[in-house]
């Protein structure tokens, strides 16, 4: 820790993207304190079964915000999940970057808000918690916009597509596809961006603009 800046890892994406299943384990392996709001909401509601799911979600969100604020103030490594669908968390991340804290975002997306809704519905059928459809549709737009706004401040951005469906016979889930990796303003992968799906094109376009601007800067 003494030899490098503190790091904040953000596993981001609209509800139903499959964030935890893709990279939750990898984030835990970073050694940073890791906060999963879904797990926190479950613990909160288990402790008080009279609490509604919405109230538990809200309490978990506020808990995560406080932990992020503490990590920034104390310059600690921290990892957490977020939809990045509103304004508070992106503003805190921008503040962290201005304080020379490395902010690394791994963003997981699906091809459409309707697929996010279907994945959440499948999760509910297995006992998971629900998210209102209007919230999912709104976050599908705003989360990507927030990533684009944050991009010039990020140490690293990875974008994954998790739209592939499980095999109906085996149940095997296809591996998520890495669509984009940007490090310190430069695109480092993949070499060919021509197959970028429509939902991720705004992110790739923003990364290409940043890459061009970064390369024009004097060394």
Where does each model-flagged region fall?
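Conserved substrate/cofactor phosphate-moiety recognition/catalytic segment
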Residues: 21-76
